Amino acid sequence: MQLSVKLTANIDGLPLTAQKFEAAAPRKNITLFCLPGGGLSKDYFDLAPNFSFAARMSALGYDVITMDHPGVGENLLPADHPFYTPREAAGYLSQALTHWDMQGEIQTPIIGIGHSLGGMMIMLMQGLHAPFTRLGLFGSSAGGLDWGLSDEEKAYINKPHAFARELEAMSLAKFGRATIPAGKGPSGESITFGGQTPELTQRLRAAASEMNAAGAMMSMMRGSFRPEANAIAVPLFFAFGDHDIGIPPKDVPKDFPSAPSTKTVILGATGHNHFAFSSIEELCEAFDGWVGD
């Protein structure tokens, strides 16, 4: 049976929680801090038997922390909370990690793991606060999603400071609200967003969650967090499905000029939600090998 415990922190009056999956022996004394993609809860990292990143990595000796983004899932904010940006959310998350470290509740070093929009949040945390010694970015890059932008929005590509000034207005104009309600999840008609089987696609639907509009807007805008990407100076591990979204994987490392090394893995017969495919085994083995290099 998988052993897990709940972690709690109060950050500037905001209660935040996470789930910690305890490492099996022999322990590596390394923590993986994991953030899900937009529209998914932390349950994405514990999707189903044999399709659980948390279970696989804890069996390999890592402590694994999974956490919902501030404002969604178990970490909903008060209805009257002011509009907040992904950079502010990255600050909340980094403060929570510091709190748990000071309380002796987590092992260091910590490796940041992010899927899709969660990868952007991990990059913001590292670029602004540097809590991690390595980053694992799954289906995530700094290249944005140009196809998700209107012509008017595209005018802000590679203009991070101008975009930051307009982020609130653009997010509310595009999505109509600060928090996007949970959707129904993937239809299963496409490998890109579905799972390998109808059952795994259903598990993705069950893991659906709210999404922060500003986070969605920022993750789609190429160059929106270029200063943070430029500042990342730790080794990077990228994983993409061969039916993933975003810019070509070969172009992704170019946005991280300060990273001392990068490794890219392409998962065959895999969509954007990697853990819903049997290639999760290849992904976990490759990641573990990279950490041990």
Locate each region found by the language model.
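N-terminal cap/lid segment of alpha/beta-hydrolase-fold proteins
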Residues: 1-24
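Short, surface-exposed "cap/lid" segments of acyl-processing enzymes
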Residues: 26-59
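Conserved alpha/beta-hydrolase
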Residues: 49-76
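Glycine-rich "HGGG/HGxG" loop immediately N-terminal to the catalytic nucleophile
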Residues: 68-84, 272-273
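Alpha/beta-hydrolase active-site loop
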Residues: 83-103
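Alpha/beta-hydrolase
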Residues: 153-243
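Conserved loop-alpha-helix segment in the C-terminal half of the alpha/beta-hydrolase fold
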Residues: 240-270
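Catalytic histidine-centered segment of alpha/beta-hydrolase-like enzymes
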Residues: 270-281
